C-alpha cells in the first residue's frame, strides 16, 4: 500500500480523512473511515485521491469508460493550462482534451497555488463546458 490517497485525503490536502487504512498486517487495505460506504463517509468527492494514485486503482470515470470502450488515447490528447473560474483562489488547471472534448482535468504538482490538488469544482466542473443542454 502506498498511502498517497490516504495522505491526500488527510493532512496533505483535504483534511477530511474519509480514506484510511482498514485492517492490520496482511489484511491491511485502503478503505473509508470505519469501513462505511463512500456516500456515508466524510468524502467531499474532490478527487484528490484520484489525482495522486500512481497505480491506476483510482481513475476518473471518463477515463475508465473510455478505456473500457477502447477510445482512450493519450497520444491524441492535448493539454492546455488555464486558471479555474470557480473562485478567487486562482488554481492552475490542466485541461486534457481528446477529439476537441475535455476528458479530464488535473493540476500540475509543481503549481505553487495548488501543489496538484483541486476542489470538486475545479476537478469535475468541466463536465458543464460546451454542454448546451439545460441542467436541473
Sequence positions of predicted segments:
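N-terminal export/assembly segments and adjacent metallocofactor-ligating motifs
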Residues: 1-136
Amino acid at each position: 500500500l502506498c498511502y498517497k490517497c490516504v495522505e491526500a485525503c488527510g493532512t496533505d490536502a483535504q483534511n477530511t480523512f474519509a480514506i484510511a487504512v482498514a485492517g492490520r498486517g496482511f489484511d491491511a487495505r485502503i478503505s473509508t473511515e470505519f469501513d462505511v460506504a463512500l456516500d456515508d463517509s466524510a468524502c467531499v468527492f474532490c478527487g484528490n485521491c484520484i489525482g495522486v494514485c500512481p497505480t491506476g486503482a483510482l481513475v476518473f470515470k471518463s477515463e475508465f469508460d473510455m478505456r473500457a470502450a477502447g477510445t482512450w488515447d493519450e497520444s491524441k490528447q492535448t493539454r492546455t493550462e488555464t486558471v479555474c473560474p470557480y473562485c478567487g483562489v486562482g488554481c492552475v488547471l490542466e485541461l486534457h482534451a481528446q477529439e476537441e472534448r475535455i476528458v479530464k482535468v488535473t493540476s500540475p504538482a509543481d503549481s505553487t497555488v495548488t501543489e496538484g490538488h483541486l476542489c470538486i469544482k475545479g476537478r469535475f466542473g468541466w463536465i458543464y463546458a460546451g454542454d448546451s443542454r439545460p441542467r436541473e
